Amino acid sequence: MTIPNTIPITPELIAGHGLKPDEYQRILDLIGREPTFTELGIFSAMWNEHCSYKSSKKWLRTLPTKGPRVIQGPGENAGVVDIDDGDCVVFKMESHNHPSYIEPYQGAATGVGGILRDVFTMGARPIAAMNALRFGEPDHPKTRHLVSGVVSGVGGYGNSFGVPTVGGEVEFDARYNGNILVNAFAAGIAKSNAIFLSEAKGVGLPVVYLGAKTGRDGVGGATMASAEFDESIEEKRPTVQVGDPFTEKCLLEACLELMQTGAVIAIQDMGAAGLTCSAVEMGAKGDLGILLELDKVPVREERMTAYEMMLSESQERMLMVLQPEKEEQAKAIFVKWGLDFAIVGKTTDDLRFRVVHQGEEVANLPIKDLGDQAPEYDRPWRESGKPAPLPANLVAAPKNYGQALLQLVGSANQSSRRWVYEQYDTLIQGNSLQLPGGDAGVVRVDGHKSKALAFSSDVTPRYVEADPFEGGKQAVAECWRNITATGAEPLAATDNLNFGNPEKPEIMGQFVQAVKGIGEACRALDFPIVSGNVSLYNETNGVAILPTPTIAGVGLLPDWSKMARIGSANDGDKVIMIGLDGSHLGQSVYLRDVLDSREGPAPEVDLFAERRNGDFVRSVIRNDQATACHDISSGGLAVALAEMAMASGKGLTIDLGECKGAPHALLFGEDQARYVLTVPADVADFVCVNAEGAGVPFRRLGTVGGDALVVDDLITLPIQQLRDTHESWFPDFMEGRGELAAE
C-alpha cells in the first residue's frame, strides 16, 4: 500500500512529523499556502534537530574552528586538516544513538557506514575508525543484548569495508538504560589540493544519483532521531536503515576513481533525510535551485510514493553534480563497479526546490529556507548548581588498598575492553602501529616512511553532570593529553554532543555550559573543532542520559619510531610522574565504585598547566628519552600504574615518599594534567632538571622491574593477578557468569 500525495494535513499529522504549531505557521507564512504531504515531509526532515541544529546552532558558532592547519572547518561532510607534504586528514564523528537502541546490529553498522561515507565523499580514503559506546547498567535486562548487537554491527561493517578500528570507549551507567549512545568516528587521507565539497556551482548541470537503489528503509529516521523515546519504541523499528558494507566498498572505489577524472563539481552523501537533505544542501550552499525528477530514481521496491523516495534513508547512496561532457565516462565507472548511475535532475537559477513525480509537481519550496535559513532557537537555559567541595580528609580511605585497586581494574568501567576490540579488525590495511588498549590509536601514513597519525576519543560524563563547564574542558583536555602521550602533536578535534531534551532549561544549561568549556579548552590548547554532530532528545520516559559531549581528536607524529606506548618500559627504568600530587576525589571512580558514592565537584582543569605539562612530555618523547608514557585519568595514579604494569608485563616498585597528602588521594585522586613516564635510569636526572627548568611539577616515583606492582607497604599485587582481574570482567559479563565479576 503506497501513500498518495494528496493527504489531508491535520494537526495530528503535523505533530506526528515533529513540527510545533509555531513552526507549521512559519511554513504557511513562507509558502503562502498549505503544504502538500511531500512538502510537509521535506520540512519535517530539514527543520528537525538532526538536520537543522536549530537548538544548538547559536552555541556551536562560539567554538574555535580555525587554525593554521585547518583547510575546512564545520559545515561540510567532514573537517579537513593539513598534515604536511601535500596531504591532509579528513575526519568526523557522528551519532547513531536512537537507531542503535531500536535495532542494535543495523543501527551501529549503518552508523559506521554513514561516517565512512562522510569521509570519502570529500575525496579521502578512510584509514581509521573509532567508536565511543555507552550502555545501561550491566545488570539491566537489555544491556547484554545491546552490547552484543552494537559490537557485532560496528565490527561487521568496518571489517567488511576494510578499515581498521583503532580506538574508542565503552562505558556503562544506569542513565543509558533506555537510550544508549553509539558515536562513530572515521578518518581518511587525501591530497590537500583535491578535496571535494558539497556546494553546487553552475546552472543547468546534471544532478546524478549514485550507488545503491532506494527502498523504504529509514523513512522518517531523522525525525525519529529528534524525538524522545517512550513505550512505543518497537513500532519505530522500520525507521532503522539496513547497511551493505560491500556495496559501500564499491561506492568508495567508484567515487575515488571518478574524482580523478575532473568530472565532479559537487558531491554529497545521502544520510539523514536521504535525497531531501543532500539535494537541498547542495543547492542552498551554492545559491542554486534544484529540480528533481523522481521517476528516474533507481528503486528496489514497487509503488513508492514521492514522500517515501524523498525521505528514505537507504544506505550507500550519493548525489553529485557533474560536468555534462563527462557523463558517459562517469556512468561507465559506476556500471563497472556494479552500482546505479542515474541523472535525476538539474541545477536551476530560481532558488526553488522542485520535485516532480509521475508528471505532477509534488513540491515547490524556497530552497534557502529549507537549508541554511532554517529556524533557529535561543532556548531558555539555566546553570546547574555545583556539588559542595569534598576535601580528601572527608573521604574514607580503603581498609585494603590492594583490594580497592583490584576492585577498580576489575570493574565494569575500568576493566579491559579486549572482548570488544578483538571483534574488530584492527590491523587491516597494514598500517596500524598502536591498537586499542593504550592512550591513542596510531596509524602510519601510507607512502611516508616516518609519518603517522594518532587518534583518541574521550569524555567523562560524570564530570559533565557535576559541572558541565569543567566537564567540557576535561573532555577536550583528556583527548589532547591522550594524543600527546604517544608523542604526537594534537592538530584538531571533532565533537559529538549527546544530551537530553533541550526544551528543558536545565538540560539546555548543561549543553550551553559544556560548549563554553569545550571552546575555552580548544582555544587554550590550539585544538580547533573542525566537524561534529549534535544529538539531542536522548531521553526515555523523561529520564535523560548523562550529558556526554564526546571529543575525538587527531594528532601528528613526524617520526613514529620515537612514539611512546603505555607498555614499553624496560627493567631498571625510572618512573616519574609529571603534574601535581593527587588530591581530588570528588566524582572519582574510587568514590563511585569502592565507596558507592557520587559526591563532590568535578576536578578543575588548569589549561595553562595542561599545555605546559603536555608540551614538556611531548618533548621528552620526541627526544627519545621516554621508554613508556601514560596519561592519568579515571582511577588516578594507581590505575595508571596498574595499566602500565599489565601492558608491559613488568612490575613497578613505587615509593610515595616525595608526595604530599593522604595516600588514598595520592593514589586514586583524579587531578588533571598528569602523566606517568618511564625513562632510562641514566637520563632520569636530566629529565627532572629539564622539568624543573620548564616549571613543570614532577615526582620521582620508583623503578621498573619484578613481577608485581608494589606501592610502599600499601599495595603488593602480582601482575598476573591484576591481569586476571582486569581481563575477566567483560567475558564473564557477556557469558552471564556471575552478576559482576569483581564484586
UniProtKB/Swiss-Prot annotation:
Annotated Mg(2+) 2 binding sites: 118, 269
A GO biological-process term: 'de novo' IMP biosynthetic process
Top-level taxonomic group: Bacteria
Assigned keywords, A-Z: ATP-binding, Cytoplasm, Ligase, Magnesium, Metal-binding, Nucleotide-binding, Purine biosynthesis
UniProt key word Transcription: no
EC number: 6.3.5.3
GO CC annotations on file: cytoplasm
UniProt-recorded name of the protein: Phosphoribosylformylglycinamidine synthase subunit PurL
Lineage: Bacteria, Pseudomonadati, Pseudomonadota, Alphaproteobacteria, Hyphomicrobiales
Gene: purL
